[in-house]
From Swiss-Prot:
Residues 1-130, 144-412, 837-1001 are annotated as: Disordered. The modification Omega-N-methylarginine is found at R56, R65, R83. Its EC number is 3.1.3.36, 3.1.3.56. This is Phosphatidylinositol 4,5-bisphosphate 5-phosphatase A. A motif (SH3-binding) lies at residues 346-351. Inositol 5-phosphatase, which converts inositol 1,4,5-trisphosphate to inositol 1,4-bisphosphate. Also converts phosphatidylinositol 4,5-bisphosphate to phosphatidylinositol 4-phosphate and inositol 1,3,4,5-tetrakisphosphate to inositol 1,3,4-trisphosphate in vitro. May be involved in modulation of the function of inositol and phosphatidylinositol polyphosphate-binding proteins that are present at membranes ruffles. A motif (RSXSXX motif 5) lies at residues 906-911. The modification Asymmetric dimethylarginine is found at R56, R76, R83. The gene is Inpp5j.
Length: 1001
């Protein structure tokens, strides 16, 4: 073989990454001749020391340079070069010269694959004979491990490794002696002379190399180009369990395994995972640490509604921050993932909800089942779960860079989400029905079946003069209805706004209140050129867990030909409604906008008979394309980004009142989908996230979108939609944490300690309210105390409720910290018990237990204006009562209720709370009190009112109101201790209560 040529024909060439192609003269072609050896094609020298492993064959260079140590052979092989794998190397003793012509020896004509087979039995003594085997198949060299002399070490050259997996390994008896390619500087030799004999039935496979991530990056181009060769031939299956070459499925092709020199006798430089799904370049993410040394591979967790489709697999090492439950305590270990259920508040020690579980150490969910939603959060899928929430098989793991998931905050991929129900209903000036449970999807009473937040938009509420007068003084009957229905389900009225007949109510579970901030309302009139509020829009915006949400309830112009006017009105509403604060100024600046109401879009082109036929035959899809709103989505730029669920329910307008029949009057209005619910998620505009991808702050999934045909009080049918929100992060740290004892059995135990965060801006008008479980709004308190700022220990403060203000008897209560700046409860406790003994005077008006336990009639007298019952100076001047339940009054004559006579717990300002128990000497209020403050000696008689009260609606003489002083200290007339038919006070305690406090907020 000395005369063998080293130069191949220029016509044959090579294939990139497949090794040299066979030439016509039996020599291996190497492509373009090179006079200089490329060091990148060198691998570390083979260690020929003894090893207990199986005998393996390796392709080693011949020459004196074979003894060079591995560190001197840097850099290692990189297949990114277009040069062939087998490059001729010069020996140390000769000069580099152009390769001469090769001799005409028989050569393989295949892709250049060399199969190295192990010998059977012990190795015979080395002999000097060397034979060349003619190709048995198409250009294939079959090399046997027969006796042969070990050649002199040569400079290190590349080792040929099979690039496919389908080739069958030949039996050792069917192969001939092994050739030695001396001229080309290559030699085939045993990997180890001292290896023990091996049975012919267990040939030693050639393991694949273990490459570093930097070398694997160089292998990528060769991998792609080597696919055709790998599809034709495959070597025997590798059986080395210690080191296996994984094949990531995402690559779409097979990597070319390159056998490193000395691999059989030296340990690998990098150890890959035993899981074949993971590539050597796989690195665990920083936020998903390994929990067990026996489980180095990340378990595939269930993938429930992935937040970002462009990201990789959900991290199993991070625990999703679920919604904060009132039963969560700071002392509970982090491995408790499901708080106890709370259909009714448990009788347990009260603690303020601390920071979310996502702040605690990560707990990976079970890989075989989806992470269950805590039953106390009220956001379970209920009876109609989304298909996206079912347990899924996670895809096969692929090579993922450490920066594939940004970790500014953990992504809530397995978070059960925040559930919102939106309801719109044009009530047509009708009286409210008796029950709205099915409309609100309350789910049969279980807390987990309901929503976390409910937005209710009403249109055409009765706004006649007399009705508006009553609603100005007291809460309208529709608001009363929804508060009564939602109160037992732990819902609290967060905010409400009304513009004539358009009303928007926003409710939330009470334990979400500390994370709802920056609540603002606005309204825009569009009727009569903007001077009348029969048409227009009202909105409530707030920040929920750090995400800006906006709810917009609109009533747009009616009739078929007013589509352009509806567009103009919607643009006017969007442009005029502006909010304060850094979060979002305009409506479309919010992260999520819900737009709903009686939008009055009609069905064009089709006549009445065709529309009714499509409805009766359940062919609603024929009407979709002619719906004005659907057509406007494609043409109006103002509607860009708004989404709506499929209209799989019949048109909701117009019906005969009291029936489910469409309009049969003389007008015969054509049915239409006038009542709609749409939403829009703000497109990311802050640039890419730290991972290089666009960061999606939240994802919205609509679970249901339907009408409710069972309600027939109006000519419209109500429409409800349920949504699931998944947040990319949660701002779930309460600004104030309250702590109380397990039970208040004695008055001296009514001590409340609270801790204030440093970022919280306190006010001297902040107060702490005591609420019964099931309270309906933030002003529906039983008693309150001013939030003092005397420190007890560091940033811990303490307040005490007076014995007179505490309710008597037994019951479950909740404490809440009301912020004057935020106008909402920013801290709540768990339900706790109050068990105080009753006395003979428990029925007096100074005792709040009597008024609270007699029934909830007095609760309907609560003033529901946003600032009416807040004990702050600016709020006490507003006496526009929004108390629900006007029908519970015997007449329009206002009389002091027992709650108004209760005294200290209803004081609207600190000045009134500091009044002595004797009547203060105030000239402007003495006339209204009369002289009956002297006690029983005063002559009995009716109350003394001012002769004329122009600003107290003097047009209605039957409505008797008093003049209220600017300081909020105005009070009702004197009460008599002796029974008197004209006196409204049943006992002298009522007089003391009035002297102590004045009118309640």
């Amino acid at each position: 073989m000395e005369g063998q040529s080293r130069s191949g024909s220029a016509k044959s060439g090579t294939r990139t990454g497949l090794g040299p192609l066979p030439g016509t003269h039996g020599a291996l072609q190497t492509g373009t001749p090179s006079k200089k050896v490329n060091s990148s094609f060198q691998l570390p020298a083979k260690n020929t020391g003894p090893t207990p492993s199986e005998p393996r064959l390796a392709l080693a260079p011949v020459g004196p340079r074979a003894a060079v140590s591995p560190p001197s052979e840097r850099p290692r092989l990189a297949l990114s070069s277009p040069r062939p794998i087998l490059a001729p190397l010069s020996t140390a003793g000769e000069q580099k010269r152009p390769p001469p012509h090769r001799s005409s020896k028989p050569a393989p004509t295949s892709v250049g694959q060399l199969v190295v087979s192990a010998a059977a039995g012990p190795k015979p003594p080395p002999v000097a004979s060397v034979s060349i085997l003619a190709p048995k198949s198409l250009g294939q060299l079959v090399i046997s491990a027969s006796a042969m002399p070990r050649p002199t070490p040569a400079p290190l050259g590349p080792i040929l490794s099979p690039t496919s997996r389908d080739q069958k390994q030949l039996s050792p008896t069917s192969v001939g002696p092994k050739p030695a390619l001396a001229t080309s500087g290559l030699s085939l030799a045993l990997a180890s002379q001292e290896q023990p004999p091996q049975s012919p039935s267990s040939p030693s496979p050639v393991p694949s190399p273990v490459l570093s991530p930097s070398q694997e990056s160089h292998l990528a181009p060769a991998t792609v180009t080597s696919t055709p060769a790998s599809e034709r031939q495959l070597p025997a299956r590798q059986k080395d369990t210690a080191v296996r070459r994984p094949i990531p499925p995402a690559d779409g092709c097979l990597h070319t395994p390159v056998q490193a020199a000395g691999l059989a006798t030296s340990p690998p430089r990098a150890q890959t995972s035993s899981d074949p799904r993971l590539s050597p370049s796989f690195r665990a993410r920083p936020e998903a640490p390994r929990h067990s040394p026996e489980d180095p591979v990340l378990p595939p967790p269930p993938q429930t509604l992935p937040l970002d489709v462009s990201s990789g697999l959900p991290e199993s090492g991070t625990r999703s921050p679920g919604l904060l439950s009132p039963t969560f305590r700071p002392g509970i270990p982090s491995n408790q993932t499901v708080p106890p259920p709370l259909p009714k508040p448990p009788r347990s020690p009260s603690r303020s909800p601390s920071r979310s579980p996502n702040r605690s150490p990560c707990v990976p969910p079970a890989p075989e089942v989806a992470l269950p939603r805590p039953v106390t959060q009220g956001a379970g899928p209920g009876k109609c779960p989304s298909p996206n929430l079912q347990t899924q098989e996670s895809p096969v793991a692929t090579a993922t860079s450490p920066t594939s998931s940004w970790s500014a905050q953990p992504t809530c991929k397995s978070d059960p989400g925040f559930r919102i129900t939106v309801v719109t209903w044009n009530v047509g000036t009708a009286m409210p029905p008796d029950d709205v449970t099915s409309l609100l999807h309350l789910g049969g009473g279980h807390d987990s079946d309901g929503a976390d937040m409910i937005a209710i938009g009403l249109q055409e509420v009765n706004s006649m003069i007399n009705k508006r007068l009553k609603d100005a003084l007291f809460t309208d009957q529709w608001s009363e209805l929804f508060m009564d229905a939602l109160g037992p389900f732990n819902f609290v009225l967060v905010s409400t706004v009304r513009m004539q007949g358009v009303i928007l109510l926003l409710f939330a579970k009470y334990y979400h209140l500390p994370f709802l901030r920056d609540v603002q309302t606005d309204c825009t009139r569009t009727g009569l050129g903007g001077y009348w509020g029969n048409k227009g829009g009202v909105s409530v915006r707030l920040a929920a867990f750090g995400h800006m949400l906006c709810f917009l309830n609109c009533h747009l112009p009616a009739h078929m030909d007013k589509a352009e006017q509806r567009k103009d009105n919607f643009q006017t509403i969007l442009s005029l409604q502006q909010f304060q604060g850094p979060g979002a100024h305009g409506i479309l600046d919010h992260d999520l906008v819900f737009w709903f109401g009686d939008l009055n879009f009609r069905i064009e082109s089709y006549d009445l008979h065709f529309v009714k036929f499509a409805i009766d035959s359940n062919q609603l899809h024929q009407l979709w394309e002619k719906d004005q709103l659907n057509m406007a989505k494609n043409t109006w730029p103002i509607l860009k980004g708004f989404q709506e669920g499929p209209l799989n329910f019949a048109p909701t307008f117009k019906f005969d009142v009291g029936t489910n029949k469409y309009d049969t009057s003389a007008k015969k209005r054509k049915p239409a989908w006038t009542d709609r619910i749409l939403w829009k998620v703000k497109a990311p505009s802050g640039g890419p996230s730290p991972s290089g991808r666009e960061s999606h702050r939240l994802q919205v999934t609509q679970h249901s979108y339907r009408s409710h045909m069972e309600y027939t009080v109006s000519d419209h049918k109500p429409v409800a939609a349920r949504f699931l929100l998944q947040f990319a992060f949660r701002d779930d740290v309460p600004l104030v944490r309250l702590e109380v004892a397990d039970e208040w059995a004695r008055p001296e135990q009514a001590v409340v300690r609270y801790r204030v965060e440093t970022v919280f801006a306190r006010s001297s008008w902040d107060w702490i309210g005591l609420y019964r479980v099931g309270f309906r709004h933030c002003k529906d308190y039983v008693a309150y105390v001013w939030a003092k700022h005397e420190e007890v220990d560091g940033n811990i403060y303490q307040v005490t409720f007076s014995e007179e203000s505490l309710p008597k008897g037994h019951g479950d209560f909740i404490l809440g910290y009301y912020s004057h700046h935020h106008s909402i409860l920013i801290g709540v406790t768990e339900p706790f018990q109050i068990s105080l003994p009753t006395s003979e005077s428990a029925s007096s008006s100074t005792d709040s237990s009597g008024t609270s336990s007699e029934g909830e009639d007095d609760s309907t007298l609560e003033l529901l204006a946003p600032k009416s019952r807040s004990p702050s100076p600016g709020k006490s001047k507003r006496h526009r009562s929004r108390s629900p339940g006007l029908a519970r009054f015997p007449s329009l004559a206002l009389r002091p209720s027992s709650r108004e006579r209760r005294g200290g717990s209803r004081s609207p300002s600190p000045q009134s709370r500091q009044l002595p128990r004797v009547a203060p000497d105030r000239g402007h209020s003495s006339g209204s009190r009369g002289s009956s403050e002297e006690g029983p000696s005063g002559p009995p008689g009716p109350w003394a009112f001012p002769p004329a009260v122009p600003r107290s609606l003097g047009l209605l003489p039957a409505l008797r109101l008093e003049t209220v002083d600017p300081g909020g200290g105005g009070s009702w007339g004197p009460d008599q201790e002796a029974p008197d038919p004209n006196s409204l006070s049943p006992s002298p305690q009522g007089r003391l209560g009035l002297e102590d406090g004045g009118l309640g907020p």
